[in-house]
Structure formats: structure tokens, C-alpha cells
């Protein structure tokens, strides 16, 4: 994990014994990605593929649900998606890279959160690794694999 100023960056890889196209079905779906994140209370996926996350952060300076407008910036099916999310308290960039392996698919997730209020960076520094655990568990559950 790297912390620079109010920015936190986490990268994690894991392998799953499922073909890349099936993993892509989950990773490319903005709703499935949002539902795996614990601070996302609800979300709306729009017709253009963008999504609005409504997040609650348990930090003193944020006393309300925050809207985060997300959109995919780059998609290379079935191997890579990069999305960005913007709000008044933080910006987030998520990258998901899928690599075929002999046993299935290697999934590399990178998240960068840039907080613009005190406490946002500390919250994600403590919790971003766990959010990647949640994403992995949601993916494994979605493709019904015993990992």
C-alpha cells in the first residue's frame, strides 16, 4: 500500500479457476463492482453505462451520504477496464486487468483513492485492502467457485 499526501494506492492479484470471459462478465458490470464495496449504500447504473454510487463514510467530517459519479474510461474486453469516480470528498480510480493462466484467470485490481477532506485518506488507508477482499469474494460468489 502506498500513501502520498491524501492519496492511497492498493494493488492486489489473485487467481480464479474460471475462464477470462466469465470473469469479465462480472468485472465489466458497474453494478456488480459497486455492490462489492462496503461503503456503497446503493447505486444507480445509467443507460450510458456510468453509475452513481451513494456512499457513507464513517468519518466525523462527512455526516451525509455522498454521491460519487463513476464511469469507465477505458475498456478492452475481455482483459481490462479502468473506471474513475468523482465526488466532493474523494476521487477514485479502479483498474481491473484479467490475464489468462493455465488454471483460469489472474485478476489484478488496483485502486487509487484521493481524499479531499481530512479523514478520507485515513479511512481508505485502513480499509481499502478489505474492500479488495470484498471484491474478490463477490467475484468468486458470482462465478460460483470454491476458492
Task: Go through each PLM region and give its residues.
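Hydrophobic ligand-binding cavity/cleft-lining segments
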Residues: 1-50
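Glycine-rich portal/gate segments that line the openings of hydrophobic small-molecule binding cavities
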Residues: 44-87, 142-146
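Beta-strand elements of well-folded, non-transmembrane domains
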Residues: 16-18, 55-59, 74-76, 87-89, ...
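A short, structured loop/turn motif at beta-sheet edges
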Residues: 20, 45-48, 73-78, 97-106
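Hydrophobic/aromatic beta-strand elements that line small-molecule binding cavities or substrate pockets
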Residues: 12, 40-41, 67-74, 85, ...
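Beta-strand/loop substructures that line and gate deep hydrophobic ligand-binding cavities in soluble
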Residues: 84-137
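Intrinsic-disorder/low-complexity, polar/charged segments enriched in Ser/Thr/Lys/Arg/Asp/Glu/Gln
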Residues: 7-13, 38, 50, 67, ...
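Hydrophobic pocket/interface hotspot
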Residues: 23-27, 33, 51-53, 72, ...
